[in-house]
Amino acid sequence: MASDRAETQRRRRQRREQVRALSWRPLMRGSLVERLRRCGRANCACAEDPRRRHGGKFLTVQLDGRTHALHVRPEDEGKVRSAIAAYTQLWKLINELTACELSDLQREARERRRARRRRR
């Protein structure tokens, strides 16, 4: 039991340290998607052939119950991808911290039950 507690505390310290390191990076929740569209010019190849449509990257984010889309220029794509990846990593770390807290609560409940049984 003591080793379980020590292991959980070690994992918790590691995850908190990783969260601190991530907090300095840009974080963004959202998705980067590519939309293929026709440009509207009658002479363009995209008007005839759907495979030749024009592409563009868009960041989609849901805020306050509404979905927002923003065009992302090619030179900004790397920065946006990095911010999304950092947010995803942060979310995983928070889930792992939640698992540590849950493990502690479960262990404490088991210990209380055992202590009550011994008193009887």
For the regions a language model picked out, list residue spans one by one.
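A positively charged, amphipathic N-terminal helix/segment that binds anionic biomolecules
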Residues: M1-R120
